């Protein structure tokens, strides 16, 4: 469902084309399908539609497919990278966003095929090129995972 922004307000939805222009991840490791509710330098919501065709389900686990928890965390981190890239207008050709640390990570529910992960992420602190985030991965109204992490912007040239 696409939401229309009020007159005079920039749209807050980011489609897959823009996501791919902003972060270097590609299928099968691109774990964000779209973003919405973007508020520059503050927050964003990432969306991942988890299908039975995801390559990790072939081995995790064939008889009871579950999205690996580390990939749920990676999806949240990619969502934060989109937030940083769009907020800071980072040129992907000259900069990269690297995951630095992970704290208070909890897995609350399995993520199975057919789930739609809704990942609200917010900036909790920033200093120079280092940003701290807090986020959750939600399935409907249930928390599947939650964590806090840090990332930094680095020059690649």
Q: Which residue ranges define each predicted feature?
A:
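Catalytic strand-loop segment that frames the active site of acyl-thioester-processing enzymes
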Residues: 24-67, 72
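N-terminal leader/capping segments at the start of a protein or of a new domain
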Residues: 1-31
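Hydrophobic beta-strand-centered segment that forms part of the acyl-chain substrate-binding groove
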Residues: 4-13, 80-118, 144, 152
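Beta-strand-rich interaction surfaces with strong enrichment in secreted/lumenal proteins
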Residues: 20, 63, 106-109
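Conserved positions in beta-strands of structured domains
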Residues: 33-36, 103, 108, 120-124, ...
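Active-site helix/loop of acyl-thioester processing domains in fatty-acid/polyketide metabolism
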Residues: 35, 67-91
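HotDog/MaoC-like acyl-thioester-processing domains
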Residues: 1-11, 40-41, 111-115, 122-157
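Hydrophobic core residues within well-ordered beta-strands of beta-rich domains
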Residues: 29-31, 117, 131
């Amino acid at each position: 469902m696409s939401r229309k922004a009020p007159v005079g307000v920039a749209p807050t939805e980011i489609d897959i084309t823009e996501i791919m222009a902003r972060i270097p991840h590609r299928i099968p490791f691109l774990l964000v399908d779209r973003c919405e509710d973007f508020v520059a330098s503050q927050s964003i919501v990432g969306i991942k539609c988890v299908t039975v065709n995801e390559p990790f389900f072939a081995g995790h686990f064939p008889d009871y497919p579950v999205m690996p928890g580390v990939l749920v965390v990676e999806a949240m981190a990619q969502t934060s990278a989109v937030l940083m890239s769009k907020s800071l207008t980072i040129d992907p050709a000259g900069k990269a966003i690297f995951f630095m640390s992970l704290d208070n990570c909890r897995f609350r529910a399995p993520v199975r095929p057919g789930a739609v992960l809704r990942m609200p992420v917010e900036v909790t602190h920033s200093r120079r090129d280092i940003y701290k985030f807090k986020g959750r991965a939600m399935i409907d109204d249930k928390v599947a995972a939650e964590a806090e992490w840090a990332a930094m912007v680095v020059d690649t040239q």
